[in-house]
Regions:
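Low-complexity, Ser/Thr/Pro/Gly-enriched N-terminal "stalk/linker" regions
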Residues: 1-60, 82-83, 87, 96
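Solvent-exposed loop and edge beta-strand segments that line ligand/cofactor-binding
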Residues: 2-16, 47-66, 73, 103-120, ...
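Well-ordered alpha-helical scaffold segments within catalytic/enzyme domains
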Residues: 6, 10-26, 66-78, 120-136, ...
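Active-site acid/base region of carbohydrate-active enzymes
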Residues: 16-36, 75, 93, 126-180, ...
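Extended, well-ordered alpha-helical scaffold segments
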Residues: 29-36, 76-91, 133-151, 194-217, ...
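Catalytic cores of carbohydrate-active enzymes
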Residues: 57, 95-101, 156-167, 174-275, ...
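Aromatic-rich carbohydrate-recognition surfaces in CAZymes
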Residues: 58-156, 182, 294-304, 320, ...
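C-terminal hydrophobic structural anchor segments
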Residues: 293-333
Length: 370
């Protein structure tokens, strides 16, 4: 991989996490799950862009924003979504870099490391928001795509190079070409074609075929190229992003989640086999089990969407449990311990008021019409 400038998290962000862990209490919202979620989404708009949460992440995170851009658009916030993209592109172009995070003052950083999915997330959200790129923005993205290919892609095959140590959605775990990353690159390839971006020359179909031929194990998409374990984002994102459109495989995955009780007590745990993964040092020490079998509401909201999209018999029960969790904590929390209590560790506690609440608010649109 070519050497790129490192954009480390500023010390102020680390202090913010420490302060939030020991000295700040969660804000609480009144009302039912829908009212709480709607209030959170409203407050995550800071007048300039959508921040990621009302707690630890009061800044811009492209990965999270990309996953809620469609939901925010469905909720009627299309102008704010596009304003967020404009602002983010301005900050990126000013520094000639694309990072996972941007502070409200426009400072770029990656947390915990540079992300394999950073550029795919940016390009995906541009496409899903129907954002009109100007020539300056297009030229910038063409350069970043060239760098991405140099850093991550085997030019002969178009596939991800093996064993990158860079981060991705489940950033406490270390992957070797995760199914999630392959799905995000498939979406980037699709979006590039439709946005008229020429510097990523590979067809989205080769990544779809890779998922089907190498990652699908009969029950779900394997976590990565060599690890056959279940990981929520790797199992769900290929269907959520429509990298794979196969209802039989989707229902096989939903069967597995049901049978293995992965969505209990709330949707849903990262994995049912946490010992089958390698974790970064901080995820084994000061933030133990952060990316193990903890419950992540991000994937939980996606899970509900997929359940209702297939009109599954367990959909209503899971939605009721999820709503009770939101009402129990009077917020949309980031993650919970396996027993359903709020996650706390030596350095870190679960954030509050996650922008992911936007996904939850659009679940009704996936329910069968009566």
């Amino acid at each position: 991989m070519n050497r790129r400038k490192v954009y480390s998290a500023p010390t102020s962000q680390l202090w913010h996490l420490f302060y939030y862990r020991y000295f700040r209490k969660h804000a609480k919202f009144e009302g039912d799950a829908e009212a709480i979620s709607r209030a959170i989404v409203e407050k995550c708009w800071n007048g300039t862009f959508y921040c990621t949460s009302l707690g630890n992440f009061d800044y811009f995170w492209i990965r999270d924003f990309a996953t809620v851009a469609k939901s925010l658009r469905q909720l009627g916030y299309v102008d704010k979504v596009r304003a967020t993209i404009t602002w983010a592109l301005e900050q990126y172009m000013r520094r000639d870099a694309v990072t996972l995070c941007i502070t409200p003052l426009g400072n770029l950083f990656d947390a915990p490391k540079r992300g394999i999915d950073t550029l795919p997330s940016l390009i995906h959200c541009i496409w899903t928001a129907k954002y009109k790129l100007n020539e300056h923005e297009k030229n910038f993205l063409e350069r970043k795509l060239q760098e991405y290919v140099e850093d991550y892609i085997n030019p002969a095959t178009g596939m991800l190079l093996p064993k990158s140590d860079d981060a991705e959605l489940r950033d406490g775990a270390i992957y070797d070409r995760s199914a999630y990353s392959v799905a995000m690159i498939e979406r980037m390839a699709w979006a590039c074609k439709h946005l008229g971006l020429k510097s990523f020359p590979y067809s989205h179909m080769i990544y779809r075929q890779e998922l089907l031929l190498h990652y699908w194990n009969g029950d779900y998409f394997n976590a990565d190229f060599n690890n056959t374990a279940f990981s929520a984002e790797c199992a769900l994102i290929p269907f959520i992003m429509r990298s794979v459109e196969d209802t039989e495989k989707l229902n096989k995955t939903l069967d597995y989640i049901r049978d293995q009780h992965i969505a209990r007590p709330y949707a849903m745990r990262y994995t049912n086999t946490p010992k089958r993964f390698h974790y970064r040092l901080w995820a084994r020490t000061v933030m133990r089990n952060y990316a193990g079998d903890t419950i992540w509401t991000w994937h939980g909201a996606y899970y509900l969407r997929l359940l209702w999209g297939q009109n599954r018999p367990e959909a209503a029960e899971n939605e009721m449990a999820f709503a009770s969790m939101i009402e129990r904590y009077h917020t949309f929390p980031e993650l919970l311990n396996p027993d359903g209590t709020l996650y706390n560790s030596l350095l870190y506690k679960s954030s509050e008021g996650m922008i992911w609440a936007a996904i939850y608010l659009t679940i009704d649109s996936y329910k069968p019409k009566s």
